[in-house]
Amino acid sequence: EEYETTTYVGYDQNAIYVGAILKHPNPNIMPKEFSQRDEIWDVNAETFFVTFNTYNDDLNFFGFQITSAGTVGDVYSSGSIESDDFLYDTIFDAKTHINSDGWSVEMVIPYSALRFPKKEVQLWGLNFGRKIQSLGETYVWSPVNVNELEYHESNGTLNGIENVSPPVRLFFYPYVQTSVNLRKGEKSTSSYTAGMDLKYGLSSSFTLDASLIPDFGQVAFDNVELNLGPFEQQFSENRAFFTEGATLFEIADEGMGGGSFFYSRRIGEEVSVGDDILENDEQVYDFDSTPQLLNTIKVTGTTNKNLSIGFLNAITDKVEAGIENLSSNQRRRQTIQPLVNYNVLSLSQQLLNDYSSISVLNTNKAGNDGLYGNNLAFVADMFDNKRGFNFKVKAFGSKTPKENSTNGFRTGISLSELKGNFRYNFSWWGVDKHYKQNELGYFNYSDHQSFSSRISYQILKEYGILREYRNYLWFHDTRTFHSSERKLWGLRFGNDFSTQNLMVFEADFAYSSRTRDYDKPRTINRYIEEPENFQAKLVVQSNKNKDLSYRFQWNNFAYFNEDYNEKKSQNRFNISTLYRFSEKFSIALKSNHLNFKDDVGFLESINQDIYFGRRDIRSVENNIDLSYFFDSKKWINLRLRNYWSRAKYDPILFSLNDNGKRTQADYLDLDFDPDTNFNIWNIDINFEWWFAPGSNLVLLYRNQLFKSDNATDLDYFGSLNNLFNQTTQHQFSLRLNYLIDYNRTRKK
């Protein structure tokens, strides 16, 4: 009764009204930490939330949240909640009031913030919830058996809404932005942009999102690292247009090799001038490597037959380079990439029961010079009626005529038990050597297959000091797809548990056999042998509700049976701390350290000869995130990241033999210095003010420094000092985003 929560629901022709009275035994010390919009879960505050499953399909739902500090959030999800689902922003009103018994909530949710069928009597799925921060627990009105079901599958019902018609859902999002760039010794430059996004309800079920003049000038910076591996670094998507409602486009991603069937960073990614473009004695004098995004549209929704549909289209302008002949001084314009059209389609049909579905996805990238890539995915995700077992089948096909004349294929199958203390999983997946997914996706495997099995034990109820406990044993065996030659096999054993004082502990141990690595040589059908190793991971995390909290993680790879008496080892140490000075002011610090001894890495290939070097790698990454809130609608945030990495090579060169072994070669055969000292510094300071529902003003200061050279004699502080000797570019930008709701404007 100390934390009793009472909720109320009402409606009229314009909106749903939600009220709640939330008792608390000590309102004066109830946590009320301020946070940014949608950041409502990992914050030291109580949270009240309500969700509406307007088609009562146990899949798609709208959620609205507010914390005891008055911070609001909203979410739209198709299935399990992902972090990107909180990028859904709509207009609704919510307020809180602290009183002697606890706190209370009032919400006004206009029908324009929802999608629901056009019929006289509505039947919606409904749930309420409350996160009680001091207890580290979340309570819901309609119970969720977490051992059997997920949140979206456990709704109660909302009856009695009658004679309500879906309104015209039309929202305009105009914006203006101005920027100034300053650099010492150079003339300042400025720019101005304006445009508009549009959200329109095509019907009661489907929504059109369009970006008429796209601009993403204030998106967060990427966490760039020194990349010495065979694959490109994958970055998070920071453009809200591509992340909002993205769940439908991610159905094919989970497990079985992972990757991203649709990797939205491909749209508008940088291009480069290849060596085949430049003729003798030519250089580039004018080149913008980032294609201009001309427009984007997205259509999403679910039919009355529980068919979820998502479609996305984007067009980027052609990219040209100005090229000059140094001898004749003649100049020419060369098209580096033509106008490109991107299409993504997702169809997901719920069938048999509330949990099972069959999905088909397609991605297509084509330019004025023809088709770049076409990929097709089929996913059958089947559950029994009691949701005790999951059976999943995936199949993929690819067509990339500019890269490969043969179509590619990959597939996978898995079976999992989902209930009880003991659970298991078996899976197999494979990909042939022709399959390509990187024109509009991200996938690194080729000629690869993997079998894995896992058994786990978990407690279903709290036991003594344990709130949660799980241990697991995992086995995997990987081989080539076509010849079935073994690459490696391994075992992993781990324990995860949390205690009644909200501490979290993890201990993980693994073994990997001697490995045939077919990726490092960057050459088809060639591999290098890697020594077997033992791995260990330890994690300790304190109670996140405390003013001072921390997380510590240590990873170790111990290799043995190395060639050439090498002492290969890898240690990674990560620590993060969060200190809350008050409900309005907090600082988070993160520091990651890597020490990799005697790593053998690719250097270059000349004709049929492939060369490797032996190197020591040191990396340090430091992050600072500082926030101060004036109230729940205005705040200042500082985000700083510094990443340093040094790869120092021994004066030893190896050539790769056909059997994966190495033979020592003459170091003088190497015609470049492979030593690398890499340092990058990013800082963003922004003031943000949400002055009206869905509308905000952002003032941003940003600078970046970057340097990469061969100065591997420098340590972290020496490299940082060297970095600061460069001239810094300073950028100031001001952006105004305004949301116009057609229904509110019409009523005025």
Residue positions per predicted region:
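Exposed, low-structure sequence patches enriched in small/polar residues
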Residues: 292-294, 300, 373, 386-748
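Structural preference for beta-rich elements and adjacent junctions enriched in aromatics
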Residues: 1-345, 370, 726
